[in-house]
């Protein structure tokens, strides 16, 4: 998950109050890393109490490591929508192969691998068919999402608000 998603989430939830929210959070922020792996490593090494990660991150620790101490924070305001996509390039010179690959990605066999191969939720598999224990994971009741146009419209302001608050 990206820091930009967090900045957009704070903007979506708090709007004009975003600066005050960032100022309140600033003393609690250990560091801002260049990527998810660096920050998650600080968390798993015990150097940080919390980390910005995926709602499904605890699943890896639960099912792969039998570590039930890591939890997702579920916010009543909702979570910023994060999706990984796959697509067919319009001018591909192999449209049949692209269609076959897309069909495979959407197939039940592929979708059943997503939870424990990518540690994320499958998009085309009913919850009743998720692996054992996955339906018990806490999930947000609400998602927040900016369209591409909306995100482009607020991104510069949201980043500037974040930068100003954290540089105080």
Question: Where are the model-predicted features located?
Answer:
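Extracytoplasmic ligand-binding site segments that recognize negatively charged/polar headgroups
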Residues: 1-48, 61
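Solvent-exposed loop/turn segments at secondary-structure junctions
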Residues: 1-2, 56-59, 78-80, 93, ...
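A bilobed periplasmic-binding-protein/Venus flytrap-type ligand-binding module shared by bacterial periplasmic
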Residues: 11-12, 82-95, 113-117
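Short amphipathic alpha-helical coupling segments at ligand-binding clamshell hinges
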Residues: 21, 93-105, 113-114
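Periplasmic-binding protein-like
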Residues: 22-26, 32-33, 65-90, 104-128
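A ligand-binding cleft/hinge motif common to bilobed small-molecule-binding domains
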Residues: 44, 48-69, 118
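Extracellular/periplasmic bilobal clamshell ligand-binding domains
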Residues: 131-168
């Amino acid at each position: 998950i990206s820091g930009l998603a967090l900045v957009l989430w704070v903007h979506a939830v708090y709007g004009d109050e975003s600066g005050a929210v960032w100022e309140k959070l600033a003393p609690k922020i250990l560091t801002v890393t260049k990527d998810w792996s660096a920050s998650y490593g600080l968390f798993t090494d015990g150097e940080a109490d919390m980390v910005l990660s995926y709602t499904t991150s605890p699943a890896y620790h639960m099912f792969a490591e039998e570590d039930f101490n890591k939890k997702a924070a579920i916010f009543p305001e909702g979570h910023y929508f994060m999706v990984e996509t796959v697509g067919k390039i319009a001018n591909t010179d192999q449209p049949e192969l692209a269609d076959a690959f897309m069909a495979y990605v959407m197939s039940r066999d592929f979708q059943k691998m997503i939870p424990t191969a990518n540690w994320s939720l499958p998009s085309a598999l009913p919850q009743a068919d998720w692996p054992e224990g996955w339906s018990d994971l806490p999930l947000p009741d609400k998602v927040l999402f900016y369209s591409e146009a909306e995100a482009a419209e607020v991104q510069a302001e949201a980043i500037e608000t974040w930068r100003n608050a954290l540089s105080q």
